[in-house]
Amino acid sequence: MLKKLFHSALWGLAAAGVILFAVPRLNNSNIFTSDDIISFKNAVRIASPAVVNVYNRSFSSASINDNDQLQVNNLGSGVIMSKDGYILTNKHLIQNADQIVVALQNGNIFEASLVGSDDLTDLAVLKIRADNLSTIPQNSARQAHVGDVVLAIGNPYNLGQSVSQGIISAIGRNAVGDSVGRQNFIQTDASINRGNSGGALINSAGELVGISTLSIGKTANEIAEGLNFAIPIDIANDVLRKIMRDGRVIRGYFGVQSDISSSSEEGIVITDVSPNSPAAKSGIQVGDVILKLNNQEGISAREMMQIIANTKPNSKVLVTILRLGKILQIPVVIEEFPVN
């Protein structure tokens, strides 16, 4: 028995010697070259100069006339959207601020003015007096997809600019947290902590994908992990343009709701009509199926919402519906979306 064991051990040692001779010694060599390292440093290098720190400062109640007593009430991030100083951030960050301070990554500090804000998307537009600022490239032809690698850039807990990495977990999320369902959120597992809000969500090419907004975190009974959300850049750009033009976002209002799961191939099934809304005033009913808006057919409920939102108040829209087997055309006068 011992002799067999001895021979087995010898064979094992011999085999090990052959393997060690044939395979390079891993402990003394790096099997990866520098070209093999997966890195997003170029994306970060492109985008990070355009991500700023945003500070909400307010007077303390004891010394309202003493500038030295301005205290930071809230902090977050922002994204420079134009070379002449327009910045997107979150509205909740600058709510009730006596002073808004923006710190660039090159160390320059500016007092910012509030151009306007939007409750429905929790976005705000700031302006600083500066020129030739860095911006993040955008690519409207590139669609965001579930599984895309994304990077969140911001100032978590005022530690300084930081980058977290994840993927797009879902797109088209609505009614998240306390939101009112118009954001069409991008969901990601890239960390968005306190201070990241208002910062940039970019793809691996360094292109702006969205504006980081919120994270679902600790509750009384559980901890949510990897549930972070951003406003898609197309919606953010639309809000930016409207606020720069009008100082606020003016949306059209129709006053219907549709459950996507109950919509048919023919059209959009109306599941609720708000009282005193334009839809109610024109006779739209629950159960009606919207086939067309003006001459546009085959649209989704989300597309309908966007079309109505971009329709000027007091404009007339011709709605083609299917009701109990009959096709009807109903004119609807669009009103301004009620903010409250």
Curated annotation (Swiss-Prot):
Compartmental location: Cell inner membrane
Protein family membership: Belongs to the peptidase S1C family.
Organism ancestry: Bacteria, Pseudomonadati, Pseudomonadota, Gammaproteobacteria, Pasteurellales
A molecular-function term among this protein's GO annotations: serine-type endopeptidase activity
InterPro entries: Chloro_Bact_Ser_Proteases (IPR051201), PDZ (IPR001478), PDZ_sf (IPR036034), Pept_S1C_DegS (IPR011783), Peptidase_S1_PA (IPR009003), Peptidase_S1_PA_chymotrypsin (IPR043504), Peptidase_S1C (IPR001940)
Any single Gene Ontology cellular-component annotation: plasma membrane
Residue intervals annotated with topology Periplasmic: 25-340
Keywords carried by this UniProt record: Cell inner membrane, Cell membrane, Hydrolase, Membrane, Protease, Serine protease, Transmembrane, Transmembrane helix
Additional information: Regulated intramembrane proteolysis (RIP) occurs when an extracytoplasmic signal triggers a concerted proteolytic cascade to transmit information and elicit cellular responses. A membrane-spanning regulatory substrate protein is first cut extracytoplasmically (site-1 protease, S1P, this enzyme), then within the membrane itself (site-2 protease, S2P), while cytoplasmic proteases finish degrading the regulatory protein, liberating the effector protein.
Record's protein name: Serine endoprotease DegS
Function text: A site-1 protease (S1P) that cleaves the peptide bond between 'Val-148' and 'Ser-149' in RseA. Part of a regulated intramembrane proteolysis (RIP) cascade. When heat shock or other environmental stresses disrupt protein folding in the periplasm, DegS senses the accumulation of unassembled outer membrane porins (OMP) and then initiates RseA (anti sigma-E factor) degradation by cleaving its periplasmic domain, making it a substrate for subsequent cleavage by RseP.
Name of the encoding gene: degS
Membrane-related topology note: Single-pass membrane protein
